């Protein structure tokens, strides 16, 4: 409604109100004394007027009836405010109507929808055909969502891809690989930070073909863990953690004696716990420890497992008394460990793979610092300086060791 029309409407209301007032004055002059006339109450218009009512009448010294014109002005102001709000709402609706048609084009562009058909694999063509049927973006952490993303129930698969697409460069032509070549390629790609996203996309492009292969399943779950680490958005991290956990749980059910399935289930339980309350954190902590121990029995020569076990022990050793008490109240037992136990696991990782990682050296330095063995702490800080800094975790570990070295040299 144009602003000029608003003005005309308000002016009309004011003229009408003035006319009613004159009519009332005329009526009171000709009516019999003592007869009162009541004005009807205004009906509530939602909560806008807060049930504003007109008082019946009052008389001045000469007995002349005076209508509460202030009330009338308040009502007019409310009407004007309502009309203004309606105009703003109409403007917002108009904006949305213009924006919505562009949304599909934007999404398809982000997903590589402008790539010509002859350059897209059959898997991608099927994916693009389903895109117009998508009506909403699924971001819940339900198991159904995870099954969909993993390729085991495909109804919502494209919705997930639409929610958190990987860079467009990886949505180009898909190279069909056999299982052995695919596994070798994704293992090689994830050795670098930049290759992890490509590794994830490569696995996702082959999920329909190798969905029932155990070696594929646990690597796909691992890739979701990689995407969790790479993401900086909380909702994306939660999305990747929950789907990865469900995929790794399914892998365990299919292959309970495969240590990698237990390893990545433990890791993803740890990631999921970051978004939970205290009770669920403790519950996931028990799951982490349980499946990590199983994985160590099945893969006794895997240094990563001992590094994770060391981190668990170190974290538990640092729990406050109140945190341990709450855990005992909720679960009937207190998680317990010591710095010495953590140190043992970190040393085991170093024994299996000398120079295993910057973070492992950092925790070795922390353990020795806590045990007041400063020379050993400095030794591992210096060894860490010889290692390349590749990942974000490496960089954070280097910064922490610089702090440790500074504090030890004081």
UniProtKB/Swiss-Prot annotation:
SUPFAM superfamilies: TPR-like. It is a single-pass membrane protein. Disulfide bonds: none annotated. InterPro entries: RMD1-3_a_helical_rpt (IPR049039), TPR-like_helical_dom_sf (IPR011990). GO terms for cellular component: cytoplasm; cytosol; Golgi apparatus; membrane; mitochondrion; mitotic spindle; mitotic spindle pole; spindle microtubule. Keywords: Coiled coil, Cytoplasm, Cytoskeleton, Membrane, Microtubule, Phosphoprotein, Transmembrane, Transmembrane helix. Residues 68-110 form a coiled coil. The modification Phosphotyrosine is found at residue 152. The keyword Cell membrane does not apply. The keyword Cell cycle does not apply. Residues 122-164 are annotated as: Disordered. The modification Phosphoserine is found at residues 51, 121. One of its GO terms (molecular function) is microtubule binding. The chain crosses the membrane at residues 9-28. Signal peptide: none annotated. Its main location: membrane. It is found in: Membrane; Cytoplasm; Cytoplasm, Cytoskeleton, Spindle; Cytoplasm, Cytoskeleton, Spindle pole. The modification Phosphothreonine is found at residues 139, 154, 157. Residues 122-131 have a biased composition (Basic residues). Belongs to the RMDN family. Interacts with microtubules. PANTHER family: REGULATOR OF MICROTUBULE DYNAMICS PROTEIN (PTHR16056), REGULATOR OF MICROTUBULE DYNAMICS PROTEIN 2 (PTHR16056:SF15). This is Regulator of microtubule dynamics protein 2. The lineage of its organism: Eukaryota, Metazoa, Chordata, Craniata, Vertebrata. The gene is RMDN2.
């Amino acid at each position: 409604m144009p602003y000029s029309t608003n003005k005309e409407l308000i002016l009309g209301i004011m003229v009408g109100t003035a006319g009613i007032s004159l009519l009332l004055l005329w009526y009171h002059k000709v009516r019999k004394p003592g007869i009162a006339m009541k004005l009807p109450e205004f009906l509530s218009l939602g909560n806008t007027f807060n049930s504003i009512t007109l008082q019946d009448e009052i008389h001045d010294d000469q007995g002349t009836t005076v209508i509460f014109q202030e009330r009338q002005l308040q009502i007019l102001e409310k009407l004007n405010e309502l009309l203004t709000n309606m105009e703003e709402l109409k403007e917002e609706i108009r904006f949305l109507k213009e924006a919505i048609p562009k949304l599909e084009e934007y999404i398809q562009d982000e997903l590589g929808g402008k790539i010509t058909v002859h350059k897209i694999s059959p898997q991608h063509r099927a994916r693009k055909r389903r895109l117009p049927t998508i009506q909403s973006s699924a971001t819940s952490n339900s198991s159904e969502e995870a099954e969909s993303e993993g390729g085991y129930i495909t109804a919502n698969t494209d919705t997930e891809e639409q929610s958190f697409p990987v860079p467009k460069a990886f949505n180009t032509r898909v190279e069909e690989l056999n299982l052995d070549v695919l596994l070798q390629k994704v293992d090689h790609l994830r050795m670098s930070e930049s290759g992890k996203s490509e590794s994830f996309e490569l696995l996702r492009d082959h999920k329909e073909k190798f969905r029932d292969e155990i070696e594929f399943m646990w690597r796909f779950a691992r890739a979701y863990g990689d995407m969790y680490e790479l993401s900086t958005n909380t909702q994306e991290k939660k999305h990747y953690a929950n789907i990865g956990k469900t995929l790794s749980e399914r892998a365990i059910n299919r292959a309970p004696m495969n240590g990698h399935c237990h390893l990545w289930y433990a890791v993803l339980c740890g990631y999921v716990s970051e978004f939970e309350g205290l009770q669920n954190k403790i519950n996931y902590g028990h799951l982490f420890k349980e499946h990590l121990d199983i994985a160590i029995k099945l893969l006794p020569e895997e240094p990563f497992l001992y590094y994770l076990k060391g981190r668990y022990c170190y974290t538990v050793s640092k729990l406050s008394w109140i945190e341990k008490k709450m855990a005992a109240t909720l679960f009937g037992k207190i998680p317990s460990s010591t710095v010495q136990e953590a140190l043992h696991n970190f040393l085991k990782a170093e024994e299996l793979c000398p120079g295993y990682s910057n973070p492992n050296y950092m925790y070795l330095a922390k353990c020795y610092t806590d045990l007041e063995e400063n020379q050993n702490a400095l030794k591992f800080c210096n060894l860490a300086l010889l290692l390349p800094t590749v990942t974000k975790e490496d960089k954070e570990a280097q910064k922490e060791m610089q702090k440790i070295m500074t504090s030890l040299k004081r």
